[in-house]
Amino acid sequence: MDPLGPAKPQWLWRRCLAGLLFQLLVAVCFFSYLRVSRDDATGSPRPGLMAVEPVTGAPNGSRCQDSMATPAHPTLLILLWTWPFNTPVALPRCSEMVPGAADCNITADSSVYPQADAVIVHHWDIMYNPSANLPPPTRPQGQRWIWFSMESPSNCRHLEALDGYFNLTMSYRSDSDIFTPYGWLEPWSGQPAHPPLNLSAKTELVAWAVSNWKPDSARVRYYQSLQAHLKVDVYGRSHKPLPKGTMMETLSRYKFYLAFENSLHPDYITEKLWRNALEAWAVPVVLGPSRSNYERFLPPDAFIHVDDFQSPKDLARYLQELDKDHARYLSYFHWRETLRPRSFSWALAFCKACWKLQQESRYQTVRSIAAWFT
């Protein structure tokens, strides 16, 4: 008898057990990997970041097209280097604000700078001392910096100090990498489009709300010539008081609103038109870029441009004629039968940046913001 015979079954049993244990270990590793992958795909916030609260509402001006299914994107970490004007704002779920966008982790916690995929720098908050206020010059590989401003070039200092630092631009300019206008028009989703305008509530003629009063500015000089022929109610510092929270109620009593910009630059069409005039259902009388520039964003019969008149006196006469001719006045509201105005929000701007970063991974450098932003 072979002396090794009795031990053979035990050896086979141990070999089978080892094989089963090995297969079990492989299975555990495989399912653990699947679970981690699923967690990453859901966009769970990284630890230590500010909670992102949902912002509800209708789609808002994104030029993206809606789709039945949102494509998978990596969950990007975006750092706000400062709050805009040092004022915190509610942070959104970008998947609810921009069609086709996945959520990003957006935070103002500067400690995440080494891990951030992108950094948004609001120019106003760093412009007085860029060398001291910019993020550290040694950045993580692949991190993109976004230059952000809603102010005109006339109010942006030290742009030349930013040469070569930034990868993307974000502003009201339509040729920005990330276009964030002060307002836009979008189609109504249903009918009727709006209630009829109550002309009986329009008891006053022309209003202007202004906080930055500079006597030598183009807009103040034009106003001074206009008010020699037409009564204009001016609200703001050193003028009629306008208590907080009463602006829309006050301006809605007027038929016309002077949407005069503080400086003249391409695409610089601000809340003076989109909010102060259009949300108050007042016809905007605009002083800013050319009529053709306004018509890129508005129907030609949605506003009155000062350039259409040889003098402020001629404009005053035209406004007085419209005041007496209800049919002609109401023709400035026909566009509202199919369109409605929407306004800028900081949350939407951040989400447009989120969407852009997801869509375009190409790394570029803006050589000179000063040469472009004029």
Curated annotation (Swiss-Prot):
Pathway: Protein modification; protein glycosylation. Its EC number is 2.4.1.152, 2.4.1.65. Changing residue 87 to K: Reverses the preferential fucosylation properties leading to production of 72% of sialyl-lewis x. Significantly decreases cell-surface expression of VIM2 antigen. Changing residue 87 to I: Does not affect 4-galactosyl-N-acetylglucosaminide 3-alpha-L-fucosyltransferase activity. Increases significantly 3-galactosyl-N-acetylglucosaminide 4-alpha-L-fucosyltransferase activity. One of its GO terms (cellular component) is Golgi cisterna membrane. The keyword Transcription regulation does not apply. Pfam families: Glyco_tran_10_N (PF17039), Glyco_transf_10 (PF00852). This is 4-galactosyl-N-acetylglucosaminide 3-alpha-L-fucosyltransferase FUT5. Changing residue 124 to A: Decreases both alpha-(1,3)-fucosyltransferase and alpha-(1,4)-fucosyltransferase activity of 50%. InterPro entries: Glyco_tran_10_C, Glyco_tran_10_N, Glyco_trans_10, GT10-like_C_sf. Changing residue 92 to S: Does not affect 4-galactosyl-N-acetylglucosaminide 3-alpha-L-fucosyltransferase activity. Increases significantly 3-galactosyl-N-acetylglucosaminide 4-alpha-L-fucosyltransferase activity. Residues 35-374 are lumenal. Glycans are attached at residues 60, 105, 167, 198. Changing residue 125 to E: Loss of site-specific fucosylation. Reverses the preferential fucosylation properties leading to production of 72% of sialyl-lewis x. Significantly decreases to cell-surface expression of VIM2 antigen. GO terms for biological process: carbohydrate metabolic process; ceramide metabolic process; fucosylation; L-fucose catabolic process; oligosaccharide biosynthetic process; oligosaccharide metabolic process; protein glycosylation; protein N-linked glycosylation. It is a single-pass type II membrane protein. It catalyses: a beta-D-galactosyl-(1->3)-N-acetyl-beta-D-glucosaminyl derivative + GDP-beta-L-fucose = a beta-D-galactosyl-(1->3)-[alpha-L-fucosyl-(1->4)]-N-acetyl-beta-D-glucosaminyl derivative + GDP + H(+); an N-acetyl-alpha-neuraminyl-(2->3)-beta-D-galactosyl-(1->4)-N-acetyl-beta-D-glucosaminyl derivative + GDP-beta-L-fucose = an alpha-Neu5Ac-(2->3)-beta-D-Gal-(1->4)-[alpha-L-Fuc-(1->3)]-beta-D-GlcNAc derivative + GDP + H(+); an alpha-Neu5Ac-(2->3)-beta-D-Gal-(1->4)-beta-D-GlcNAc-(1->3)-beta-D-Gal-(1->4)-[alpha-L-Fuc-(1->3)]-beta-D-GlcNAc derivative + GDP-beta-L-fucose = an alpha-Neu5Ac-(2->3)-beta-D-Gal-(1->4)-[alpha-L-Fuc-(1->3)]-beta-D-GlcNAc-(1->3)-beta-D-Gal-(1->4)-[alpha-L-Fuc-(1->3)]-beta-D-GlcNAc derivative + GDP + H(+); a beta-D-galactosyl-(1->4)-N-acetyl-beta-D-glucosaminyl derivative + GDP-beta-L-fucose = a beta-D-galactosyl-(1->4)-[alpha-L-fucosyl-(1->3)]-N-acetyl-beta-D-glucosaminyl derivative + GDP + H(+). It is found in: Golgi apparatus, Golgi stack membrane. Catalyzes preferentially the transfer of L-fucose, from a guanosine diphosphate-beta-L-fucose, to the N-acetyl-beta-D-glucosamine (GlcNAc) of an N-acetyllactosamine unit (type 2 chain) of an oligosaccharide, or a glycoprotein- and a glycolipid-linked N-acetyllactosamine unit via an alpha (1,3) linkage and participates in the surface expression of VIM-2, Lewis X/SSEA-1 and sialyl Lewis X antigens. Preferentially transfers fucose to the GlcNAc of an internal N-acetyllactosamine unit of a poly-N-acetyllactosamine chain acceptor substrate. Keywords: Glycoprotein, Glycosyltransferase, Golgi apparatus, Lipid metabolism, Membrane, Signal-anchor, Transferase, Transmembrane, Transmembrane helix. GO terms for molecular function: 3-galactosyl-N-acetylglucosaminide 4-alpha-L-fucosyltransferase activity; 4-galactosyl-N-acetylglucosaminide 3-alpha-L-fucosyltransferase activity; alpha-(1->3)-fucosyltransferase activity; fucosyltransferase activity. Belongs to the glycosyltransferase 10 family. Changing residue 86 to H: Does not affect 4-galactosyl-N-acetylglucosaminide 3-alpha-L-fucosyltransferase activity with type 2 oligosaccharide acceptor.
